[in-house]
Amino acid sequence: MNEGLNVVAFKEMKVPESLAMMHYDVHKDKPFFPWLVDFISSAPVLTMIFEADNAIQKIRDALGATFVQKADPDALRGKYGIWAGINIAHASDAPETAAKEIELWTNEGGLTESSDAEEEARAYITKYAVGDVDYTMEIRNTVKDAIENHDTSDSVPQKLTELLSKDAEGIPSEQIEALAKVIFDFVIEEVEKS
C-alpha cells in the first residue's frame, strides 16, 4: 500500500481462542500468554499478507518498536498503540516465522491470497478513516493514569468502553466490552507489579 508493499491477502476476522493459542505458542510458558490469547481474540483483527523486497523489515519499520512508549511517534504503534504491548499490530520477525504464520493463518484462519486484496484493504481504510476524530491518546492516557495512580476501580473499564465505543462504529458492544476488559486486565497486572 506504500513503501513498495503489496497486499496479497486481507481479511477481517474474530480470532478463535484455539487459533490465538497456536499463533502465540512460542510464548505458552510465559506468564503473559493467557493475556495475549485473550487480547487477540477479544475483538476483530485484520489479517494480511504483504509481498515486497525486504517486506518484513519494511513492515517492522512502519510499525515501530513493540512497546508503544518506545515507538517513534510517527510509526503506527507510536500513533495508535495504547500502552506497552497493547500495540495494535503483530508482524513476523523473520522469513521462517513469516512462512509459519502465513501457513497457520491460511490453514486455520481462512486467510486467502486474492487479486482483490489490495482493493479490499483500501476500502477498509476508507470506511474507517472518516473524520479527524481519534481517541487513541485519550485511551492511552486513561491506561497510563490508571497504572500510575493504582486505579483499578470500575470507572477505568467504563471509561475504556466509552472511548473504544466512540472509536469503533459498527462493532458490536460485546466485542468492545471484551476489548476494554482485556485492556483493564493489563492495567490490573501492571498495578499489582508495582
Please give the residue ranges for each predicted region.
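Non-catalytic terminal and connector segments of soluble metabolic enzymes
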Residues: 1-194
